Structures are given as structure tokens and as C-alpha cells.
Amino acid sequence: NLLQFENMIRNVAGRSGIWWYSD
């Protein structure tokens, strides 16, 4: 599921403080 994948990426990026992923 693409939405779940996006949420996972956002979650990981948020915890590591690295915002390499955005809409």
C-alpha cells in the first residue's frame, strides 16, 4: 500500500530529523 509506505518514510525521517522525503 503506497500510503502506508509514505507514512513509514515520514515516520523514519521524522525520528532521524532528516526530511529527505516530502510531497
Curated annotation (Swiss-Prot):
Keywords associated with the record: Calcium, Disulfide bond, Hydrolase, Lipid degradation, Lipid metabolism, Metal-binding, Secreted, Toxin
Cofactor note: Binds 1 Ca(2+) ion.
One GO cellular component, as annotated: extracellular region
Compartments where found: Secreted
Function: Exhibits moderate hydrolytic activities and prefers the anionic micelles (dPPC with deoxycholate) to the zwitterionic micelles (dPPC with Triton X-100). PLA2 catalyzes the calcium-dependent hydrolysis of the 2-acyl groups in 3-sn-phosphoglycerides.
GO biological process, one term: lipid catabolic process
EC number(s) reported in the record: 3.1.1.4
GO MF terms, alphabetically ordered: metal ion binding; phospholipase A2 activity; toxin activity
Record protein name field: Acidic phospholipase A2 Ts-A2
Cofactor list: Ca(2+)
Keyword Calcium among record annotations: yes
Family per similarity comment: Belongs to the phospholipase A2 family. Group II subfamily.
